[in-house]
UniProtKB/Swiss-Prot annotation:
<comment type="similarity">
    <text>Belongs to the terpene synthase family.</text>
</comment>
<feature type="short sequence motif" description="DDXXD motif">
    <location>
        <begin position="577"/>
        <end position="581"/>
    </location>
</feature>
<dbReference type="GO" id="GO:0034277">
    <property type="term" value="F:ent-cassa-12,15-diene synthase activity"/>
</dbReference>
<feature type="binding site">
    <location>
        <position position="729"/>
    </location>
    <ligand>
        <name>Mg(2+) 3</name>
    </ligand>
</feature>
<protein>
    <recommendedName>
        <fullName>Ent-cassa-12,15-diene synthase</fullName>
        <ecNumber>4.2.3.28</ecNumber>
    </recommendedName>
</protein>
<dbReference type="GO" id="GO:0016102">
    <property type="term" value="P:diterpenoid biosynthetic process"/>
</dbReference>
<feature type="binding site">
    <location>
        <position position="581"/>
    </location>
    <ligand>
        <name>Mg(2+) 2</name>
    </ligand>
</feature>
<dbReference type="GO" id="GO:0010333">
    <property type="term" value="F:terpene synthase activity"/>
</dbReference>
<dbReference type="GO" id="GO:0006952">
    <property type="term" value="P:defense response"/>
</dbReference>
<dbReference type="InterPro" id="IPR001906">
    <property type="entry name" value="Terpene_synth_N"/>
</dbReference>
<dbReference type="Pfam" id="PF01397">
    <property type="entry name" value="Terpene_synth"/>
</dbReference>
<feature type="binding site">
    <location>
        <position position="577"/>
    </location>
    <ligand>
        <name>Mg(2+) 2</name>
    </ligand>
</feature>
<feature type="binding site">
    <location>
        <position position="577"/>
    </location>
    <ligand>
        <name>Mg(2+) 1</name>
    </ligand>
</feature>
<feature type="binding site">
    <location>
        <position position="581"/>
    </location>
    <ligand>
        <name>Mg(2+) 1</name>
    </ligand>
</feature>
<comment type="function">
    <text>Involved in phytocassane phytoalexins biosynthesis. Catalyzes the conversion of ent-copalyl diphosphate to the phytoalexin precursor ent-cassa-12,15-diene.</text>
</comment>
<keyword id="KW-0460">Magnesium</keyword>
<dbReference type="InterPro" id="IPR036965">
    <property type="entry name" value="Terpene_synth_N_sf"/>
</dbReference>
Length: 830
């Protein structure tokens, strides 16, 4: 920004005594001299362009903010994927290494108004006064982003605060005149109940108007309008006069500059943090310091003014929250793998702060919940005990975010509550209960109708993280991503990291992946035909859904062979299940098992039927091919493990077929011993296990930990299948179902619904235990990426059987297939 007009009294930093001692390193976004075109200061994103991404080429053109014809766009796509992609990664990597904060005119103004102790006619922070003089926009306003020409309540509030600061020290008469003129021209916005408002605007803005009138300033607005705002302010205060909750007191302390002498300062200072601030907020701290001298509060403001060269952000410190938010964004959009070392450094530092109970984490509900979730899912040992203060709704309401009913905070704690790794985690379960109820109430509010926030809440409630596919989540987050990334607090808080870099890389990566997925799916469809599997009249033709489960989890470009191996194995398990369940004769089933036990190329006369020939040849050739590839990668024989797991699956299928033919009802325990294997997930996971780039020791599948993960995953899969398929199976005359067996074993004392409830408890316990094994001890013979395959399969099963048997219901998975594989991205905005 440039200095507008000569100051009336020369150099203000030199005029005022009491400047703070120099020191600190500047990490604030630099302020440029203001051009007349209102260009934004460096580091601040400008306007938005509506986009529709149709291809990698179109993605490149759109991310560049250009409208181009296809050939030109194709050329840009090639450039993005080669040079620009590296530049994007380098830019993001740099941003992860340090957080740069945007300046806050509102907070800087309140700090500028703090008088020098013992000299009420001089400011404690003349540097802030200078910054205000040098950073007015040419329309008379002060705001975080002058490129946004439309005034809003935040800009009005910031401008009035800056006017008050200049008037307090009797400088910048022309700046004051132009600021008041801006307020007068746009005052109707302050009267608009529907306009987005900063937190506490109804308290602080009328209070500033009163302060302006009391100091002799003539605000060019009707007195009736000022009286109306003051009346509304008084009504707000009176309405809450009987509320003595801690949450209310926190709110009043947060708005210390707006409540002023209405506050009991000894009580307000109970919210002071170790660094001397109130809520890490400069304006709150300055508001308190103007009425109640405190050395620690003064030192906090001095440190900020020195660190940022005369300007302050709206929150500080904010490093942990900002860095975790970036990590979360990278994970949510599917590009975290490119920044593994940087993310590890951030999480290591966060974990150290967690163990030290750093106030930046522990005193902020959102940061605490996000830190817990990211640390847990990345293998750090964190306890939900640190969330005990919000275990109940009353505890949350006692916080500032709770009093404000902050949507982001509620959503964050709700998502975190689903990351339990113990059967009876009362804290997380309680958080999930009250936060889920609160989110449902928010859905009924008109305030979030038609907003991305509503879609976020709906998605979180419908699909807990354990019933989602990664690539579906990535697409959803890319589409909903806010490239501006600002947050409205008392004033707008805008990160200076270039969120458009995140979005551009994610779009490029997703579009490239879709192209790969389409090619791989074409190969799989040819594989089905080449192996004559489409000629099996009894088999469900679901190769696309089988591929979806692989593509949406092992999604990285280099894992193409693992994806197709996963899909082919999953499809073969479905085909053979159909052979044993509905489509095959007993002789065909026995013949197939006998051929598998020999595991060699049979003669033509060894096949009982053409169907058996088609199935066995496809299985034999596919398993041997995958085994040879995996053995070469691992340096030892893997084929034997694949054959063994297939034999285990088919033997269990045969046992269940014999139960059905003889109308034998096994015990629930007998059924589960077979059922957790016969669904075939173990074979599917193993088909990719040796192909994802991790070295596994010989005999890994014989380890107790492997067997336990197999059992837990299989338990979830079988029981989820049984809950969703019981009505269909009973109508088909099939009695071997976990739900019906529990009802039978109860002797009539348990209803079907009660049995389903019991089964869901067992699923929940197994899922939590599985997650504990996946995110637990990092050392051991089974690398975490391999453990994660079991977890990802568990998530797939939860999604497929979320409401119905998705695998058996033709329309259930169509939208997921389209979103991951077929439909081009459509972005709302950049």
């Amino acid at each position: 920004m440039m200095l507008l007009g000569s100051p009336s009294s020369g150099g203000y930093g030199g005029k005022f005594a009491g400047a703070s001692p120099a020191g600190g390193t500047t990490t604030m976004a630099p302020s440029a001299k203001q051009p007349s075109s209102r260009a934004p200061p460096p580091g601040i994103t400008g306007g938005r362009n509506d986009l529709r991404i149709l291809s990698p080429a179109a993605a490149a053109a759109a991310v560049g903010g250009l409208e181009m014809k296809k050939p030109e766009a194709e050329g840009i796509a090639e450039s993005l994927q080669a040079t620009h992609r590296k530049e994007l990664e380098a830019s993001i990597r740099k941003q992860l290494q340090g957080v740069e904060l945007s300046p806050s005119p509102y907070d800087t103004a309140w700090v500028a108004m703090v008088p020098l102790r013992g000299s009420s006619h001089n400011p404690s922070f003349p540097q802030c006064v200078d910054w205000i003089l040098e950073n007015q926009w040419d329309d008379g306003s002060w705001s975080i982003d002058g490129s946004i020409s439309t005034a809003n309540k935040d800009v009005l509030s910031s401008t009035l605060a800056c006017v008050l600061a200049l008037n307090k020290w009797n400088v910048g008469r022309e700046h004051i005149r132009r600021g008041l003129s801006f307020i007068g021209r746009n005052f109707s916005i302050a009267m608009d109940d529907q306009a987005v408002a900063p937190i506490g605007f109804g308290i602080t803005f009328p209070a500033m108007l009163t302060l302006a009138n009391g100091s002799g300033l003539e605000v060019p607005v009707r007195q009736n309008d000022i009286d109306s705002l003051n009346h509304l302010r008084e009504m707000k205060i009176q309405r809450e006069a009987g509320n003595h909750s801690r949450g209310r007191k926190a709110y009043m302390a947060y708005l210390a500059e707006g409540f002023g002498n209405l506050l009991e300062w000894d009580e307000i200072m109970m919210f002071q943090r170790k660094n001397g601030s109130l809520f890490n907020c400069p304006s709150s701290t300055a508001g308190a310091l103007a009425n109640y001298h405190d050395d620690k509060a003064l030192q906090y403001l001095q440190s900020l003014v020195n660190k940022f060269d005369g300007v302050v952000p709206t929150l500080y410190p904010l490093n942990i929250y900002c860095q975790l938010s970036m990590v979360d964004a990278l994970e949510n959009m599917g590009i975290s793998q490119y920044f593994a070392s940087e993310i590890k450094s951030i999480l290591d530092m966060t974990y150290s702060s967690w163990l030290g109970r750093d106030e930046e984490i522990m005193l902020d509900v959102t940061t605490c919940a996000m830190a817990f979730r990211l640390l847990r899912m990345n293998g750090y040992d964190v306890s939900s005990d640190e969330l005990s203060h919000v275990a109940g709704a009353s505890g949350f309401r006692d916080s500032l975010q709770g009093y404000l009913n902050d949507r982001k905070s509620v959503l964050e704690v709700y998502k975190t509550s689903k990351h339990s790794i113990s059967e009876n985690d009362l804290i997380l379960d309680s958080i999930g209960s009250w936060s889920g109820s609160l989110l449902k109430e928010m859905l009924c509010s008109n305030g979030i109708q038609g907003t991305p926030g509503r879609e976020e809440i709906e998605f979180a409630l419908k699909y807990p993280f354990y019933s989602t596919l990664e690539r579906l989540v990535h697409r959803k987050n890319i589409v909903l991503f806010d490239a501006k990334g600002s947050q409205m607090l008392k004033t707008e808080c805008m990160p200076v990291h270039d969120s458009q870099d995140f979005l551009a890389l994610a779009v490029d990566d997703f579009c490239i992946s879709q192209s790969n997925y389409q090619n791989e799916l074409n190969y799989l469809e040819s594989w089905v035909k080449d192996n004559r599997l489409d000629q099996l009249h009894f088999a469900r033709q679901k190769i696309t859904y089988c591929y979806l489960s692989g593509a949406a989890t092992t999604f990285r470009p280099e894992m193409g062979y693992a994806r197709t191996s996963w899909a082919r194995t999953a499809w073969l398990t479905a085909v053979i299940d159909d052979l044993f369940d509905v489509g095959g004769l007993e002789q065909e089933q026995e013949n197939l098992l006998a051929l598998m036990e020999k595991w060699e190329e049979p003669g033509e006369d060894e096949y009982y039927s053409e169907d058996v020939k088609i199935v066995f040849q496809a299985l034999y050739n596919t398993v041997n091919e995958i085994g040879a590839k995996a053995s070469a990668l691992q340096g030892h024989d893997v084929t034997k493990y694949l054959v063994d797991v297939w034999l285990h699956v088919v033997r269990c299928m045969k046992v269940e077929a014999e139960w059905q033919r003889s109308q034998h009802l096994p015990t629930f325990e007998e059924y589960m011993e077979s059922g957790m294997v016969s669904l075939g997930q173990g074979a599917t996971v193993m088909s990719a296990l040796f192909l994802i780039g991790e070295k596994l020791p010989e005999g890994v599948v014989e380890l107790e930990e492997y067997d336990e993960m197999f059992r837990l995953m299989g338990t979830c899969g079988r029981l989820l299948n049984d809950i969703r398929g019981i009505e269909r199976e009973e109508s088909d005359g099939k009695m071997t179902n976990g739900v019906s067996l529990l009802v039978h074993a109860s002797g009539g004392s348990m209803s079907v619904d009660e049995a389903k409830t019991e089964v869901m408890k067992r699923i929940d316990a197994s899922r939590r235990k599985l997650l504990s094994l996946v995110v637990g001890e990092q050392e051991g013979p089974i690398p975490r990426p391999c453990k994660q395959l079991f977890w990802k399969m568990c998530k797939i099963l939860h999604l497929f059987y979320y409401q119905t048997d998705g695998f058996s219901s033709p329309k259930e998975m169509v939208s997921a297939v389209d979103a991951v594989i077929k439909e081009p991205l459509q972005l709302r905005s950049l």
